[in-house]
């Protein structure tokens, strides 16, 4: 006489969870700008632009990078004096108000692969030029020799460009804020902080 095998309810629950988890892995996740009356949004590249104290700061999500939450940052100095900041001081705030520091350079290869080279969205330079023709994104920024290797200094009417990588929070959080703090004026020591507000869309 044949015995009927019974499937226990807990195994059914586990199976359903695994199926749902597998489906979520194939969801498209995009980081997009949140409307801010104090900011300019570039719709094609999803970039956010803030202007304060003669400094223009831009943040653009790199949605083609899947292993981490990645952002391109551009700082343009329109003042007549030098400004400086430290990239390592930048951080991200998630929906739960948890602070996440950038991934250390020594771990970039682990997360991104040996041959990874970050690129800004191709629409971004065109949109920036249309918005402000005095800011040109062509050509690499000119680095300055410094005693402090952690500090980035920007000459008047020049820009700095860099990339920030964070352990992936866009899976669990619906909102992200990128903070670029303490851009210091070498003229009067004024410090300027920029906050970029993004939302996470899944589909």
What are these regions (language model features)?
Residues 2-12:
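Bacterial N-terminal signal peptides that target proteins for export
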Residues 24-47, 91-93, 125-203:
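Surface-exposed edge beta-strand/loop patches
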Residues 75-79:
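Asparagine-centered strand-capping/turn motif at beta-strand->loop junctions
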Residues 13-22:
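Bacterial N-terminal signal peptides
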Residues 58, 70-74, 84, 91:
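Soluble periplasmic/extracytoplasmic beta-strand elements of cell-envelope proteins
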Residues 81-89, 103, 176-177:
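Short, hydrophobic/aromatic beta-strand segments
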Residues 88-134, 144:
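Structured domain cores in non-transmembrane regions
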Residues 65-72, 160:
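Short, solvent-exposed loop/turn segments enriched in Ser/Thr/Gly
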